[in-house]
From Swiss-Prot:
Claim: Aminoacyl-tRNA synthetase is one of the keywords in the record: yes
Species for this entry: Paracidovorax citrulli (strain AAC00-1) (Acidovorax citrulli)
Gene: leuS
Placement of sequence motif 'KMSKS' region: 645-649
Alphabetized GO MF terms: aminoacyl-tRNA deacylase activity; ATP binding; leucine-tRNA ligase activity
Origin organism lineage: Bacteria, Pseudomonadati, Pseudomonadota, Betaproteobacteria, Burkholderiales
PROSITE patterns for the chain: AA_TRNA_LIGASE_I
HAMAP family: Leu_tRNA_synth_B
One Pfam family linked to the record: tRNA-synt_1_2
Motif ('HIGH' region): 42-52
Descriptive protein name: Leucine--tRNA ligase
GO CC terms of this entry: cytosol
Catalytic class of the enzyme: ligase
Length: 897
């Protein structure tokens, strides 16, 4: 064993050993308790970042710990390989997306292997592989057969830069989630999946407080995010009537404009209605009203989601049309509002300014009447200022509402619903915020939708025998839209499955969230050419622990749940939910430094080029360049923006490869685990990285020290540490074993809780105790030392497997106890936790005066005798005779004098 800790050599030797043993390949084993632990598969962007390192190390620690405890653990890995970045890189570099993607996969896989992750690479999948996406297409056809997939034309979010449709969840503040371009609204035909058919089940299983919820192993924050996104609302759907006729002379919408409300108790306070820009009444008004036409055109930019509309300025325009109030017969003005979504409900809303904050602001802006119809006792209504109680439905009572006055919220809703139903104009109804999932994308690098377009028979499904529809690998996007339109090879020889005439393929591809909605099931049986999933999924699913960022709380996690339920209903899997437990690891943060350029833009600087300016209290007040950067000399003042998520754009990322090359993979792993609990954010600290490296060097140096002991004595000590039956431990050895096993008990508990930062701190306590032990020659001393270091290596092994393997093998543990790959988790020795003596607090008249040591089994009389004979008692009692002695077992003695 080498004297100096050289991470590159230690890690190279460990990798060679693990590869030779094919250490991490797993198979189904009915004789073992299974555990499926999986990190969200990465997009092959080119290089790992520190967030990847943290995520995968969390997974690896869990995997190795459970294997040491006898579990059959699956830890697979794959690549979310389709998507727009590959097309954009191809456009920039002039190479096909396939080449760019597979080159990145090769490099990132090499990085993962350098990290020493216990991944079963025999189960690797790439979603751009035809053998994988064939099953996307196959299940899509099954969904078509069952009516779960369907085609329709709808207003969608159009990203003008990427030339594609975006799902509602992919629009942020009115802009595309990837490009930042202002999103437009367009009517485009596409394929949709009926996720709404599963809305109630999706809600029931995730809802916080629901006794039928099954996802209790998920963070409440994620569960609430999904619950709010699904958005179940109980209310009343009713119609305002009208006689507005279209160009055909018929009443538009059969003379009814429907709305949905959860506040039917305020129906008597309606003073206007607003319709979406795409509503038939808006289109009718636009034909004769230029202001309406111009407003509708303006509304075609921006998002189509509730989230986007909630943040943008609320605007509207009068249509000049009126509808009739269903209960009062009063005429109600119709407006076009940019905040009304055609895809939600009926594309129209009632306006009650007095009791809805959005309507209140809208009414003040445009001079619309405000009519109070709810009163909370003791409050005064102000027509010029919104107050939160205006919307209070729990404590309010209806007023100014004719026959409905004096009613509570529930009473009024029921009464109004009954009245509307009596008139045939409305009824109680449940609505959902969730909308069907549009999966068509006007891009090349994705799963081809298996549809053939025939002039005679329209859209015809591709026969199953012709799957997969293979994506051409030679396309290089030129920025002018979907290259599949122009790729004649993609359409060559295609015939209609119905009539046999020449036809063309569908050129839309599937949303890449389709790929990630079931990959975790394919891991269970990745090479099966005959079935999407088979017996492997029955053994491994549901996944026991899923690990990934909270940014996937709605998109990926909701779609994966839906996809699993569809597969269940098709008889493909037996589980209702894919993920039993979810851990959302915290972001990795770093300092951000910038300055304004002469042109008004921002220039960001790498942290290693910057030094802080601090006040007397040590608070950072500014920053300056430590080194010259470009034309800027050292000492140039720059702005300190605080800490934020690591990103390339802000030059505050840390390259894991550089970290591994300088300190080794074990240091990178240890640092990301020690600095913060897995679910908390991690603020990068170079000094703490150095500290992690120094700790591992201390571990290695202690191993070298043990290696210097006589080999025969060491081997005998290892054998002794294995059985302990014939070992007589002296006082010093017992004290060491007490400390080691006390820490081990806590560490084991922390491993079970996945609190890996305290696992590492426990390992540090163990090393301190071992280094402080100076009685190797005392009775049982060497055995206690060897046992303790063997425990430390096994505690560290899940976090830092390379150095643990090197020391375990180099010191001879493997010869007696077997390969560390197969070593069981160390068990806490109850005997080691038993103390010959314990320390009790000594009090005199209730005041702390010292401490005494007593035999651990001492009775009350013996404890009293020792207390009264102690030096501390005689010193503080000053000759006073004891009147009473109170003993609290295991804690203290109080002498009353």
């Amino acid at each position: 064993m080498q004297d100096k800790y050289t991470p590159a050599e230690v890690e190279r030797a460990a990798h060679s050993h693990w590869t030779a043993r094919d250490a991490y390949r797993v198979t189904e084993d009915a004789g073992k308790k299974k555990f499926y632990a999986c990190s969200m598969l990465p997009y092959p962007s080119g290089k790992l970042h520190m967030g990847h390192v943290r995520n995968y190390t969390i997974n690896d620690m869990l995997t190795r710990y459970l294997r040491m405890n006898g579990h059959n653990v699956l830890m697979p890995m794959g690549w979310d390989a389709f998507g727009l970045p590959a097309e954009n890189a191809a456009l920039k570099n002039g190479v096909p997306p396939a080449q760019w993607t597979y080159d990145n996969i090769a490099y990132m896989k090499k990085q993962m292997q350098a990290m020493g992750l216990a991944i079963d690479w025999s189960r690797e999948v790439a979603t751009c592989d035809p053998d994988y996406y064939k099953w996307n297409q196959w299940l899509f056809l099954k969904m078509l057969e069952k009516g779960i997939a369907y085609r329709k034309t709808q207003v969608v979010n159009w990203d003008p830069v990427d030339q594609t449709v975006l799902a509602n969840e992919q629009v942020i503040d009115g802009r595309g989630w990837r490009t930042g371009a202002l999103v437009e609204k367009r009517e485009i035909p596409g394929y949709y999946l009926k996720i709404t058919d599963y809305a109630q089940e999706l809600l029931d299983h995730v809802q916080v407080g629901n006794p039928n919820a099954t996802l209790t192993g998920w963070p409440d924050k994620v569960r609430l995010m999904q619950e709010n996104w699904i958005g179940k609302s109980e209310g009343v759907r009713f119609a305002f009537t009208h006689d507005i006729r279209g160009e055909d002379g018929q009443p538009i919408g059969d003379g009814r404009m429907y709305v949905f409300t959860t506040r039917a108790d305020t129906i008597m306070g309606v003073t206007f209605c607003a319709v979406a820009p795409e509503h038939p009444l808006a289109a009718h008004a636009a034909r004769s009203n230029p202001d309406v036409a111009a407003f509708i055109q303006e509304c075609k930019t921006g998002g189509t989601t509730e989230a986007e509309l909630a943040t943008q300025e609320k605007k509207g325009v009068r249509t000049g049309l009126t509808v009739t109030h269903p209960l009062t017969d009063e005429p109600i003005e119709v407006w076009v509002g940019n905040y009304v979504l055609m895809g939600y409900g009926d594309g129209a809303v009632m306006g009650v300014p007095a009791h809805d904050e959005r309507d209140f602001a809208f009414a003040l802006k445009y001079g619309i009447e405000i009519k109070q119809v709810v009163l909370v006792d003791g409050e005064t209504f102000d027509y010029h200022r919104w107050q939160d109680w205006y919307g209070d439905k729990q404590n309010g009572v209806t007023i100014n509402s004719d026959n409905f006055s004096g009613l509570s919220y529930q009473e009024a809703v029921s009464a109004v619903a009954h009245a509307l139903q009596e008139k045939g104009l409305g009824e109680k109804k449940t609505t959902w915020r969730l909308r069907d999932w549009g999966v068509s994308r006007q891009r090349y690098w994705g799963t081809p939708i298996p549809i053939i377009h025939c002039d005679e028979h329209g859209a015809v499904p591709v026969p199953e025998k012709d799957l997969p529809v293979v994506l051409p690998q030679d396309c290089i996007p030129d920025g002018s839209g979907n290259p599949l339109h122009k790729h004649e090879g993609f359409h060559a020889g295609v015939k209609c499955p119905v009539c046999g005439k020449a036809a063309r393929r569908e050129t839309d591809t599937m949303d890449t969230f389709v790929d990630s909605s079931w990959y975790f099931m394919r891991y269970c049986d990745p090479k099966n050419a005959d079935a999407m999933v088979a017996g492997g999924a029955d053994y491994w699913m549901p996944m026991d622990q899923y690990i990934g960022g909270i940014e996937h709380a709605i998109l990926h996690l909701l779609y994966a749940r839906f996809w699993t339920k569809v597969m269940r209903d098709l008889g493909l899997v037996k589980v209702d939910e894919p993920f039993t437990k979810l851990l959302t690891q915290g972001m990795v943060l770093n300092h951000i430094y910038s300055r304004r350029t002469d042109k008004g833009g921002k220039e960001y600087f790498w942290p290693h080029d910057v030094e802080h300016i601090q006040d007397e209290a040590g608070k950072i007040t500014g920053a300056r360049l430590k080194n010259a950067v470009g034309d800027l000399p050292a000492g140039t003042p720059i702005d300190y923006e605080g800490v934020g998520t690591m990103s390339k754009s802000k030059n505050n990322g840390v390259d894991p490869q550089e970290l591994i090359e300088k300190y080794g993979a074990d240091t990178a792993r240890l640092y990301t685990m020690f600095t913060a609990p897995p679910e908390a954010t991690l603020e990068w600290n170079d000094a703490a990285v150095e500290g992690s490296y120094r700790f591992l060097r201390r571990v290695w140096n202690f191993g070298v020290k043990l290696a210097g002991i006589d080999a025969a004595a060491t081997e005998a000590a290892i054998q002794g540490a294995q059985s302990l039956q014939d070992v007589q431990f002296g006082k010093e050895a017992k004290a060491l074993r007490l400390e080691i096993h006390t820490v081990l008990k806590q560490v084991d508990y922390d491993y079970q809780r996945m609190q890996y930062n305290t696992v590492v701190s426990g390992a540090m306590k163990m090393l301190n105790a071992l280094e402080d032990f100076k009685s190797a020659d005392a009775p049982g001393g060497l055995v206690a030392l060897i046992e303790g270091f063997g425990i430390l290596l096994r505690v560290l092994y899940p976090a830092t497997p390379h150095i643990a393997h090197g020391l375990w093998s180099g010191l001879g543990y493997a010869g007696s106890l077997g390969d560390l790959l197969d070593a069981p988790w160390p068990q806490v020795d109850a005997g080691a936790l038993m103390q010959d003596e314990i320390e009790l607090v000594l009090q005199i008249n209730g005041k702390l005066r010292g401490a005494i040591r007593v035999p651990s089994g001492a009775d009350k009389a013996e404890i009293e005798r020792i207390a009264l004979a102690s030096e501390d008692f005689h010193k503080h009692a000053a000759g006073a005779a004891p009147k009473k002695v109170v003993v609290v077992p295991g804690r203290l003695v109080n002498v009353v004098v």
